[in-house]
Amino acid sequence: MSAVSLRHVSKTFGIGGRAVTAVADVDLEVRAGEFVCLLGASGCGKSTILNLVAELDAPTSGTVEVAGTTALMFQESALFPWLTVQANVELPMKLAGVPKDERRERATRLIESVHLGTFARKRPHQLSGGMRQRGALARALAQDADVLLMDEPFGALDAMTRDTLHDELDAQVRERRLTVLFVTHNVREAARLGDRIVVMSPRPGRVTASFDVPIERPRRIDSPEVATLAATVTDQLREEVLAHARG
């Protein structure tokens, strides 16, 4: 069963001589419960696809179908600075009309699950970058969405913090059987996290290759299996860039 389906999707920004086509004729299926990493060079339209799936924008042509609801997590935590971690995580439930006691209990469980229990009463400026992203992950999970959309959520973090958050995300996704569409330009990150890696060409972005990830979990980003797959995918990306440069 498909959780996300894009058929012949194109997106153009602007009109006339200033028009820029970000993605062209994209076909993409994400199965329910699948973790798909969308990989490509900067500017290839990865974030555009995420915005289309999240219904933050509409395609110029083609169709986008999502089975259920979505939650979006960005590279920056986007936590409200005047709210505590607890209040930030409770907010989507409050907006959805969840009773106060229930949302407080659920938020507390989520905060503890991402190892922020002792920081629940802190505000974002009192947290490290990794802690803020943990809070953002808890808030995304609080929406109880069917599809989790992640736009380079760990791109600004140091390697050790990123690796820790990979473990935490992996545990949350497996426990909740979430469907994830994860945008990254980090090949090893994609091999570490994904069930499948989808490669996009330089702009206008097109899906050019798909790699299943048959590596048993739990995975380590420095494992030989991850390194071997990352090398194969990197070769594909290099070919895409060279082909684009040759015109």
Name these PLM-found stretches:
Residues 39-41:
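The feature captures the beta-strand-to-loop junction immediately N-terminal to the Walker
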Residues 54:
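Helix-to-loop junction immediately C-terminal to a conserved catalytic motif
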Residues 83-90:
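Short coil-to-helix segment of the ABC ATPase nucleotide-binding domain corresponding to the Q-loop/switch region
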Residues 94, 101-119, 171:
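Conserved ABC ATPase "signature" region
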Residues 137:
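Hydrophobic anchor residue at the start of the ABC signature
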